[in-house]
Each structure stands twice: as structure tokens, then as C-alpha cells.
Amino acid sequence: MFCPLLAVASASQTTAKVDLVVVNKSESRLSVMRDGKVIKSYLIAMGDVPSGHKLKEGDQRTPQGRYILDYKKSDSAFYKSIHISYPNEEDKLRADALGIRAGGMIMIHGENPRSSLPPKEAQKYNWTNGCIAVTNKEMDELWKMIDAGTPIEIWP
């Protein structure tokens, strides 16, 4: 039996605005949350070196810590993207103390347009330079749920 009210509730649940994004690097998962509850979870691809905190530009690592998703870019080279405010002040101080450049331009973005793999297959591999990648279809969902200013926590 089809229940239209349940279909509408389910669809609106995945497009409602979220108040936190959590990335669990060890599980290769991005979860969107509202009021402390997971709304939806996605399999992600990350940098070629997925373990450890990003220390410097070019290290192929995805940063760890608390950041802000500070702006959206609809004309990204990887479909659409949402910018992560890396480096934060702590990251900058660490890099300065080590005499290195912290890097930047870390994003949540869509698929690699040059990949010959089907989107879900490509998500099984870490292929970014430190960004967090989802499929284009998933990026469309995230685009609707995430506003600029939403916090993101990236866990080891």
C-alpha cells in the first residue's frame, strides 16, 4: 500500500536544512545532522593519504577538526562544491611554527569528470587532493540541505 504522506515526509527529511555535518574519516562517511540526529549518511572519497591531519599544502590529506562550510560554488571543476574553512587559526599557527604552508581550498565536491569508473565504484577509492567527494546526485542533495555557515566536524 502506498502512503503519500509518508512519501512526502521521507522526501522532505532529506532536503530539510541541517545544522551540522560530521565526517568520520576512518569510516569514509559524511553524515548530515539536525538537532543531534543523523538525517542521512554518505560514502565519501578523500585525499590519497586518508589517515592523519592535514599539515601542509600538497600532503594529500583531508584535515581534521572543526571548521565552517563558508561558501558554495556552483561552477566547480568537480560539479558543485562547498568550501571548508581550512586552515583555521590553529592550523595556521602549526604551519607557521613548522615553517610550511598549510594549504587550503578544501571542499566537499562531486565526481571527478575525468574518471572512467561509475560514480559508486569511484567512491570506493580515495582520489582527491584532500577534499571530500560524493557522487553528483549526492552533491545535489547536500546542496539543498547545507547553508553557508554550517559547521563541519572532521574526525579521524
Describe the predicted segments one by one.
Residues M1-A7:
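Bacterial N-terminal signal peptides
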Residues S12-D19, S26, M46-Y71, E89-R94, ...:
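N-terminal post-signal-peptidase region of extra-cytosolic proteins
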Residues A16, Y71-P156:
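Exported/periplasmic cell-wall-interacting domains
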Residues L20, S41-L43, R66, M105, ...:
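Well-ordered beta-strand positions in beta-sheet-rich domains
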Residues K37-V49:
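Short Gly/aromatic-enriched secondary-structure transition segments
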